[in-house]
């Protein structure tokens, strides 16, 4: 699963997900892409499950680019712990995804194959997504 090799700080604040994605909202590598249509935190496990679903479907043909990377640590407190005594320890990593952000790209396969692979990947994700091609890569 994906996670940063090292970070400047162990813990982060939660933050807010307002507005549309300003960067990462155009197709740069492949011919087809999966675009988020709502904001969400996507865990490294969900990204890995989506990647596996796509690679299993397209088998040997084509290339997949994962444009989303989980760089935000999410902390959790131990079970049945009283309030106070600081923030919990980092448990897993998430990627902050805003509407319009392109998460996966595919090239080297026909459109029906890419569409089905993206559909299988989208089922593993907790948000609504949109399949786009290089011609119409807008929100």
From Swiss-Prot:
A single Gene Ontology CC term: cytosolic large ribosomal subunit
Molecular function GO labels: rRNA binding; structural constituent of ribosome; tRNA binding
Cited SUPFAM superfamilies: Ribosomal protein L16p/L10e
Pfam families assigned: Ribosomal_L16
Keywords: Ribonucleoprotein, Ribosomal protein, RNA-binding, rRNA-binding, tRNA-binding
Presence of the UniProt keyword Coiled coil in the record: no
Domain of life: Bacteria
A GO BP annotation: translation
Main function: Binds 23S rRNA and is also seen to make contacts with the A and possibly P site tRNAs.
Similarity-based family: Belongs to the universal ribosomal protein uL16 family.
Subunit structure: Part of the 50S ribosomal subunit.
Name by which UniProt lists this protein: Large ribosomal subunit protein uL16
Organism: Microcystis aeruginosa (strain NIES-843 / IAM M-2473)
């Amino acid at each position: 699963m994906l996670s940063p090799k090292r970070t400047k700080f162990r813990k982060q604040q939660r933050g807010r997900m307002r507005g549309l994605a300003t960067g990462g909202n155009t197709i740069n590598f492949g011919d087809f892409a999966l675009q988020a249509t709502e904001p969400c935190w996507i865990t490294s496990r969900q990204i890995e499950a989506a990647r596996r679903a796509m690679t299993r479907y397209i088998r040997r043909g084509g290339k997949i680019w994962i444009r989303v990377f989980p760089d935000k640590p999410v902390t959790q407190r131990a079970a049945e712990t009283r309030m106070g005594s600081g923030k919990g320890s980092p448990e897993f990593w998430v990627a902050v995804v805003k509407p319009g952000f392109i998460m996966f790209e595919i090239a080297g396969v026909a459109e029906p194959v890419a569409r089905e692979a993206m559909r299988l990947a989208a089922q593993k994700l907790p948000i609504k997504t949109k399949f786009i091609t290089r011609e119409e890569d807008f929100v």
